[in-house]
């Protein structure tokens, strides 16, 4: 199966059904990237070129050898400080105020099965389906440790990549950039394929020549966004849907991201993907670690169609979970366009009757069933059934609809709060906002601080009380605005840069608790339509 270490060549070779991925530990302990592409045998270090490149820095270990420079060598996990002036994958501020790190090889481990990422969505697999490679790296001066994680699913030609950063210094360090995956290509002319858009017009394909300099897409919005999808393809020039070689990266994450392709002075190309670095600053005390969300990699020598199929098969079989994983999803009608906020329980029942006549499987009661929610100015955060509006209990309404042979679903927007709500009046500090500044609003609402455990717990308890009232088989989880005013009562000062990422972890925690405690629940992850159409959300949906 998939992973072989050669002691004589100091190479790691990952073999999938149709591809080969190879790395090598060089004489100085740096981990070089040798090859990724069509399946092959042998050691690919002949692809490396050692030449005196003017003004390219040489590490001390290389002595007077001016042909050795990390500024031109392909690397597996490039960092700042080593003389490589291309965009790094990892950057940090050390306890003494210096920048960057110098990671050298320490050891490795190969095991059956696929690694897990606590608190994060990730591809999963049985022991016989996958293997994991862990490569241990260390900065000999500061003691910083990094574990590079590779999950290999040979049948799909998919390799997942993540990394764990561990602070062993006596004092605090601060991560300022954390990308999960990087591939350096020494040779080749490429096109970059990305997917742009806006609300109600997401994921339009754009194909751009990879010229000198950097091409960057990403999201600073706190979600993966309508504007750019966290997926990127690097394709050889002649690649079509059915022929040619191409490489894909898909980020298994639902927050801010950055995907970058950089072509350097010598025509080499670096592709990387991971967390958005703007407003990201993550301190680690001694003994603490940071896990970078994973990226799915795939390579196809049979065109873009095969690349898409690789990712689709892996996502459907080894990322999606739950009761509906292998089932046809129900056909539903949603009350929003039919009623907006103006409805009673009887209106929803009549909608279900008509749905039954049309062969529709489910009715979803959208916005307006809770608190004082009769328009979009109030009520968000108060997840208590408005029985006066429904003219009865939610449980009775669900029972009547189920008696028709129609399933029932319900809308929530768990991450949001209106200032005109009981929750906000009781806990104004639970909203993300900067003290002393009037917050930016979107759709007349603020965002709850899901980086805080007590906020997540409070919303969870409210949702459970509603879900326990009847046979609710479907939840439409909405999220109708982006993050602004990044202020938190818990994460402020030198910890303010944690908020973006911790917020996403809070969303994942709540969704994991819901699908665990309500295993028959089908969760639809809506975000104003397609602002969270990413692999991370598919893990819970």
Predicted feature residues:
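Short acidic, Pro/Gly- and aromatic-enriched capping/linker segments at domain boundaries
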Residues: 1-12, 265-285, 520
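Conserved, mostly hydrophobic/aromatic
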Residues: 18, 163, 287, 333, ...
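An acidic- and aromatic-residue-enriched active-site/binding cleft used to recognize and process polar
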Residues: 19, 26, 168, 178-180, ...
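Active-site neighborhood of glycoside hydrolase catalytic domains
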Residues: 386-393, 399-403, 424-541
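Polysaccharide-binding surfaces and accessory modules of carbohydrate-active proteins
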Residues: 5, 10-17, 21, 31-262, ...
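Aromatic-lined carbohydrate-binding/catalytic grooves of carbohydrate-active enzymes
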Residues: 324-464, 474
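Short Pro-Gly-centered flexible turn/kink motifs
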Residues: 98-105, 282-301
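Terminal connector regions
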Residues: 298-330
